[in-house]
Amino acid sequence: MDKKLLTPGPLTTSMSTKEAMLHDWGSRDTKFIDLNASIRDSLVKLIDGEDKYQCVPMQGSGTFAVESMVSSLTQKDSKILILINGAYGQRMKKMCTYLGRDFIEYEVAEHEVHDINKIEELIDSNNLTHVFAVYCETTSGILNPIEDIAKLVEGKNLSLFIDAMSAFGALPLSSKTITFDAVAASSNKCLEGVPGVGFILVKNEVIQNAKGNSHS
């Protein structure tokens, strides 16, 4: 019997997951196309996003999915507030630097969460378009107050992007209770799947407005 992987991800996979990988699929086969559509629909249902959101699967890591979200769904003239309390907030900062996006940062220690009043102060004193937040910071396991952040961002009429890698599928994230424009996650953490598939759940109108943003 294989030992259990006590890591954030990849996780130990179930026998049913392993058995599902025994089959070969042609990318243009009807069964594969239907399976892909079914998976996308199921992921959208996890955020109660039917008819409002689309799932964009990415053949790559969770970081690749986050980078795709940042690069394709923001504009060159966007101004972003990045909330940082660990390595993955820092990673979004690095992405914005490489992409040439204008941003400010609010960083606290890895064992602390961000103060909502301070976030509001930063929003009110800067001409922002987006706020980037990590739901569960993988490096420490700390949970950020995503519902409070989302309510504040919605009230300021800004766009919220969430890195939910270590939360998606395990912690509440419903579009019926909080407002967000895009969330990135992956197959190999709380969903207990195999590595290699990241995905972004994005509002229909946001993906329509992103036409022409992609670098490839």
Question: Could you tell me what each predicted segment is?
Answer:
Residues 91-102, 120:
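Active-site-proximal loop->helix
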Residues 2-59, 63:
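A glycine-/small-polar-enriched, mobile loop at the entrance of the PLP active site in fold-type I
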Residues 53-81, 85, 89-93:
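Conserved beta-loop-alpha segment that forms the PLP phosphate-binding cup at the N-terminus of a helix
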Residues 176-188:
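Conserved active-site segment immediately N-terminal to the catalytic lysine
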Residues 114-169, 182:
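Active-site phosphate-binding strand-loop segment of PLP-dependent enzymes
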Residues 12, 188-216:
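Active-site C-terminal subdomain of aminotransferase-like
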Residues 5-7, 56-59, 105-106, 132-133, ...:
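General beta-strand structural signal in soluble alpha/beta enzymes
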